Every structure is written in structure tokens, then in C-alpha cells.
Amino acid sequence: MNLFTRISSRTKKANLYYVTLVALLCIASYLLGIWQNTAVNPRAAFDDSDGTPCEGFTRPNSTKDLDFDAHHNIQDPPPVTETAVSFPSCAAALSEHTPCEDAKRSLKFSRERLEYRQRHCPEREEILKCRIPAPYGYKTPFRWPASRDVAWFANVPHTELTVEKKNQNWVRYENDRFWFPGGGTMFPRGADAYIDDIGRLIDLSDGSIRTAIDTGCGVASFGAYLLSRNITTMSFAPRDTHEAQVQFALERGVPAMIGIMATIRLPYPSRAFDLAHCSRCLIPWGQNDGAYLMEVDRVLRPGGYWILSGPPINWQKRWKGWERTMDDLNAEQTQIEQVARSLCWKKVVQRDDLAIWQKPFNHIDCKKTREVLKNPEFCRHDQDPDMAWYTKMDSCLTPLPEVDDAEDLKTVAGGKVEKWPARLNAIPPRVNKGALEEITPEAFLENTKLWKQRVSYYKKLDYQLGETGRYRNLVDMNAYLGGFAAALADDPVWVMNVVPVEAKLNTLGVIYERGLIGTYQNWCEAMSTYPRTYDFIHADSVFTLYQGQCEPEEILLEMDRILRPGGGVIIRDDVDVLIKVKELTKGLEWEGRIADHEKGPHEREKIYYAVKQYWTVPAPDEDKNNTSALS
């Protein structure tokens, strides 16, 4: 072992002895300190009761109760208790109740120009707070296209038309269902053959005619058979006491509304329809200074057609069957011809029982003729042609928008629409020309894209919306630009696009320019339609729109009235609004839940989707037993 190794070994041993000695001394010092402290005051380490308190500190009395009571005079609010809202069933006699077309209420109004048959809604205190029942035995309607030709008797239990129109082949009753052969007063060979006759006079197949209006539509066979030609018809007729013509149309899956030509404008914008039709509709076109034809002119697009069949057309051959004199019928046709000329319409053709007029593409020539034909005058510029909610019908000619080329009689006033189906997604003329604030062509295209995404998401939430044929009649309660309906254009459905009169922008004209149909509506009032009209209801921000105007339960009860048993609902709105709506729908016996926005859970806007449960009035025997028990 070398010297360096021996020195290192001794150094390590010395360090070990030193460390051990220091540790023993520390332990001894610690133990001595504990012994001394314990000997002087054994409680000192754990108890300061004998010590001097800190300056300014007062020891509380540990036995005194603490007082948490309020010492003010304001009363506490009463405890909040959740009360479930319940809406009882209305009487069975109200199963076809139409609040704004009530027969008893109508008797209070003038019969002049059929004013009494127009909309007359109940006062706020008269509004029913009950659910309209379906008739006993109600069944889900047949799916389209079978529904065009057949409907369940239990759903519309009226046989009056089968007797009254037996020889005209309107409708037949067999066993438990109605059959619709497609006949009509003026088309004994059927609606298809009748439309073929029209198609030989004007082109119905090239896509230029997409929207039509049928005045006094009967059971809407004309509109039903136009659908196969890609023409969507707004059919309307008055509320019948027993015949239920519009109700039959809706059961068939055909667009229709309750309506009448009387003293107020039809609830549609100007320049809406490519074609207007009257087949023995019994409207006195030549009377009242031609006001009814002027209303047709208002809603007819530039270059649109008006078709008239039935009295007085072809009176020379049919006057005996109509049980009217030749002079009377001749005078009626003369009146119609005069009014049509005063509107600058051109008579295209009269062949057999059909007569067709065409509205001019613009008013270049018509303004010149006003120098000779003083009547009717053009309506004033402050008379908005698109205002059509309880708006009085005027005996004046609605002016068409100015055209850029003041010499070309074929230039379409307001802008030309594309042919169907390109028309659906093309930028509408009203948007192109900047007629609506905030809606640019770019905004329109973005809105179209947005609703395609939303409808795709809806179909994931409500599988029945995505099931082909499950729904047929749809209504969009706040349609805006019609994006919801446009996204469903390839499905076998039709959508009633509603633009609320309270909406910031009147966009219904844009919807019609897209080749879709719709109407104006105030959702604080009932819609002009029968109970159980729609299979599906879409409501975008409707309850937010009507906050402070009427109660949400009033809107929900109307939605329940027009929705079929088993029908679907999608409501999108602010989450706070939807929570309240969802609670109210429990009283309607809807089953539903709230889902996240399509963008995700961080959006305040949510989606409530629900289904109306199936229920009807009790069976007749059961109802009698209940009545006996109550008495």
C-alpha cells in the first residue's frame, strides 16, 4: 500500500468519528430542552389560556348564539313553485274549427261584396285555450303520390260533395275512403285532359310557368295534376259550411288555403304568379269597376297568363245548360273584355270553353293609353303593391317597375326570372336590383348554402324528415328567403313559406321569384287553413320575433291546431326561449328534446324538435258514457 492510500484511509475514519459526535450532542441538546419546558409549564406548548391576550383583541363568548336573521322591513318574496301548464281538449264539435273563418262571427259583417266571408279573427279574450281534437278514427293520410287520388273518410267525414257533384266526377265515397277521379265542372274528361288542352294553347312544359294561382279551386284537382308538370299552384276557396273543399285538397297533399275575392287583397305579393286560373269560379270579374281582375293583375307576373273557363266563355253553345239568357251572358263577357283591355292585357286565344289573356311585360304602351283610357288610373306610388295583409282592394292599376329600355315591349319589368329548375337557386331579380336592404347577391347565395347545411342536420335529428314520403305538407313559419324550402326541393314535399307581417324585411316576393309559394301571416292570429293541415312545422326565431306581442302559448296552440297527429316540429331559437317553449309543449302532449346548434354546443341558438302525439275525440259510445257520468 502506498503512502497516498494510507493517508486517505485515516482521513475517512477521522471524519466518521467527528460526524457521529456532533449528532450525539444535537440529540442531547434537544432532549434537555424538552425536559426543561415541561417542568416549568406542562400545558404551555398546547394552551394559551393563561397567557396575556394580544392588544386590541377581545375573546368572544363561545356560548352566545350567532344571529343570522335579517334586520330590515322588506318582506321576503313568496317561494317560487313550478306549475305544469295543461291545455284541455276542445269539444268534439270544434274538430274543424277555423278561428278566423267562423260562421257565427261572420254574420256580424256586411254581405256586400261578400265581406262577411273574409278573415274575421276573434278578439283576444275570445281566443280558445284548448287543443282542437282530431275526429274519432282519424288516420295518417296516404303517402304522396297515392294521396292525390284517395283520402280516408274518417279524416274529413263529409259526403255532401259526393252527392252535389256526383255527375261532375269530383269525388266518390266508397267504404272507408274518398276517391278523386280528377273530374271537375269544366273538365268532364278529367283534369289531365283539361290541362293538355291548355298546353296546346300556351307552353306549360318549358319551365317558364312555375307558380300558379287557382281561384275558387274546388277540391284542387287542377293544382293536383299540374304538379306532375312541375307547376306549383296556390289553390284557394272560401270556408264551406259542410262541403270542406279546401280540406279535401289538403288531405290530398295539394297546396291550398281558405280565401275569397271580396274587399281585401289576397295575401300574396305583387308579380307572384306566372299563371292565374278560374274554372267556373263564380267570381263577378266584370263588376265592382273590375276590382277583382285588377287584383289578379297585381299578383300576376309581367307576361303572365289569365285562363278563364266556364260562364260566360262559349256562352253561344252553353247558355241553355247554364240556365241564363243569351243577353245576360253576352253582357258579362263584354264587361270582362272591357276590363281586360283597360289593364292592357292581350287576348291570346279563345277556343271552345277556354279563353286566355296575357299581361304585358311592361307598361310602356299602357302609360300611353292612359291618355285615352282614363280608367283605371295607375295606383299611387305610396300604395305599396306588396302590402297585402288586411289591405283594402283598390280599383286602380298596379304600375310595373320602370324598364331600362323604354322602347322594347318585351323587356320584363322588374327583371326576368330563370326557367325552372334553374330559377330555384338563381339570384332573384328583386335581389339583383337591390330592392331589399341588406340582401346582396352574395348574401343570398350564402343563405342558400347555409340552409342546405341546416336541413341536412335536421334530417339527422328528425329521421322522419329524411324518410321519403313520410311528410308531404310542410309550413315554414318564418321563411325569410325560402332557403328551408329550397333545400327540400328534391323531396316529395311542398312548403308553405310564411313571411310574418312583423318581419323586418318583406321577402315574400323573392320567394315567389325562386319558384316557391307562400303567404303573409300574423302568428298572433290563426292561419286561414283547417286543423291538421300540415305534417311538419318549421319555426325559425318565431317566438323571439313575437315577444311582447302575444303569449307563446297562443302561437303554440295554433301550431298544434294546424299540425296532424304524429306530425313533426322543429323550432330554432335562443336557448332561454326554447326552455320555456319546451315546458309549454308538455301541456300539448308533444314529445321532444332540445339539441345543440349545428355549429356545436357553444351557440346560444338551439334546436327543439318534437312530435305531436296521436289522440282523437272519444269513440261515440265512450263519449255518451262520459256525458252520462258528468250529468
UniProtKB/Swiss-Prot annotation:
InterPro entries: Put_SAM_MeTrfase (IPR004159), SAM-dependent_MTases_sf (IPR029063). Residues 36-631 are lumenal. Keywords: Endoplasmic reticulum, Glycoprotein, Membrane, Methyltransferase, Signal-anchor, Transferase, Transmembrane, Transmembrane helix. GO terms for molecular function: methyltransferase activity. The chain crosses the membrane at residues 15-35. SUPFAM superfamilies: S-adenosyl-L-methionine-dependent methyltransferases. It holds the Pfam family Methyltransf_29. It comes from the Eukaryota. This is Probable methyltransferase PMT16. It comes from Arabidopsis thaliana. The lineage of its organism: Eukaryota, Viridiplantae, Streptophyta, Embryophyta, Tracheophyta.
